[in-house]
Amino acid sequence: MGSSDGTTTTTTVQEIADATITRLLAAGLIQPKGQKQKRVNWERQISYEYLQRFYPDVPHWTRIEVGPMPPGENSFLYSRTRRWADAVVREPQNMLLIEFKMKAMPDVAAQLLNYKDLLPQTPLFYKYKDLPIKCRVVAALCDDQTSKFIKSQGIELEMFKPMNYEKWYTEKILKK
């Protein structure tokens, strides 16, 4: 190849490939060799934003295990078989169980109803066992059929779009 000063410059295929790979890595479009692409926890973002906006000064727990602990010395081993609720909020008159979904699906209703049964058996929440328990799904997207089903189970549905909604929608729904 000729350069502007009249000298000849040779660029190998390997140099072009290396430069291209460097640009793709810098843009975040590919991952370095041997490194797995990080999985985005979309629900963690929606839960954080929602709780900070609506319950900043209210006692709440996130990613909390619910259910009884088996008695005995090996109870820690069984703790991994317990269920995990996205959030539990202590409201003035009740406990509120929340599941966060970017796209709500019908199975979230069964999930919440199961957690509702397990919450009073959770050691951390024994002192609240006599309070009513409400269930809520907070979702960024939900179709009409799923919405009707969730509500028919006595579960509240609240629509809430977090800051990462457009990115999630593009990657997961439009598959771009």
Q: Where do the model's predicted regions map?
A:
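Charged, terminal alpha-helix-loop-beta segments
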Residues: G2-K176
